[in-house]
Amino acid sequence: RKADGQDAAGDAFAWRVLKRMIFLGVFILCQVVPMYAIYTFGPEIMTAFGLGEGHEAILGESAVSLFFLVGSIPAMFWLNSMGRRKLLLISLVFMGAGLTILGMWPMAPIFVVILAFGMYAFFSGGPGILQWLYPNELFPTEVRASAVGIAIGFSRIGTIVSTYGTPLFLAAFGVGPTMLVAAVLVGICLIMSWFIAPETKGKSLAETSALEESIPFTRRV
């Protein structure tokens, strides 16, 4: 009976670790693919939105890159004042809204395109930080290194998908559908985060990495 109890406890531990691993992997993949697509193919995407060729497209992409940088600064403070979960959900809503505008209105005026890209880039700061913070907070010591490794692995997968998939999809379907696919990925991340993303604000590392069901996965915003 003792052995059976130990086996059951081991199975429960493995399932809770797996559940967090799935959350981490999907979260990182859905966050990284659109971001790296915009990072890597910014000038081409800007040209497709009518920002012109060469220097004009590069200037537009540089403005978006500035939003990426600026957005990460307040996010570092909001992580503790607002909380991880709330910051993640709010950020994903605005990121998805920006991409949806771009996807539904590919012929929008230039200022709308820049503002929509800026909205996405600015609010990506929070998820970008959580991409590396969550693996260290959500897993006990014995599996934490593996969790960080998995996070890095999914990040690399997202980079590969963006690098090889974005130009092919742009050429085949155009910039509007490409942005809508990116918005769908952000939407998937939002839905999953609503049901699964934990709040670790104000908790010690021992508390956040504990695998009891009562601690990590709350649906309260």
What name fits each language-model region?
Residues 54, 141-151:
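Loop-to-transmembrane helix entry/capping segments in MFS-fold secondary transporters
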